[in-house]
């Protein structure tokens, strides 16, 4: 990751390097062992969201990275990607597009199926969610296998948008998602990396 500073409005000093900010945020991510199943170390971002200082620092990291990038929209993946994605869109004065699980959107949709470890799932987007040529930032909370984010990328591209980058708070590189996304042509930015899954 490259060095970055935090805005003067942030509670973290402006001279802080991104590495320091990463450590600060990482310390506030709760690890819940054996949830939702035995052997999984669940990375819980809710402590970051509950604390106003941590939330401000987190949002500032994304806002500073993407301001001035000529974006038209931010798309967030159901459900935790909605939280960060909508705040970042607001801060950048952009619209927000939800990418939902199948059957949750009321208007005409475009769907994309993706593989899970034992089966498949589908995400959808409204058919009028973006226009050809739109430059879109795609956000989720965590990158594990990368399947959901890759499906979101394909949906946006089918509508003619360019996905400028995928972004998440947490990367679990051992699960292969970040490699899958980058190999699939999606540049990726994550704030924290954790070993295991």
UniProtKB/Swiss-Prot annotation:
Gene from which this protein is expressed: apt
Keyword Cytoplasm listed: yes
Subunit and partners: Homodimer.
Signal peptide: none
Lineage start: Bacteria, Pseudomonadati, Pseudomonadota, Betaproteobacteria, Burkholderiales
Protein name per UniProt: Adenine phosphoribosyltransferase
E.C. numbers: 2.4.2.7
Role this protein plays: Catalyzes a salvage reaction resulting in the formation of AMP, that is energically less costly than de novo synthesis.
One of the record's GO cellular component terms: cytoplasm
NCBIfam families: apt (TIGR01090), PRK02304.1-3 (NF002634), PRK02304.1-5 (NF002636)
């Amino acid at each position: 990751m490259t060095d970055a500073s935090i805005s003067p409005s942030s509670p973290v000093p402006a001279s802080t390097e991104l590495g320091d900010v990463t450590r600060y945020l990482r310390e506030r991510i709760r690890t819940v062992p054996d949830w939702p199943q035995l052997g999984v170390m669940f990375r819980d971002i809710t402590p970051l969201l509950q604390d106003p200082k941590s939330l401000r620092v987190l949002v500032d990291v994304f806002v500073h990275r993407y301001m001035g990038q000529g974006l038209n929209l931010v798309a967030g993946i159901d459900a935790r990607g909605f939280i960060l994605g909508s705040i970042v869109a607001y801060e950048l004065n952009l619209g927000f597009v939800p990418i939902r699980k199948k059957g949750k959107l009321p208007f005409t949709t475009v769907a994309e199926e993706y593989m899970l470890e034992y089966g498949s799932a589908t995400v959808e987007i409204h058919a009028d969610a973006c226009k050809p040529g739109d430059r879109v930032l795609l956000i989720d909370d965590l990158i594990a296998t990368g399947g959901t984010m890759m499906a979101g990328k394909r949906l946006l591209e089918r509508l003619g948008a360019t996905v400028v980058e995928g972004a998440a708070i947490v990367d679990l590189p051992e699960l292969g998602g970040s490699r899958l996304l980058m190999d699939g042509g999606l540049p990726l930015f994550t704030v924290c990396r954790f070993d295991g899954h």
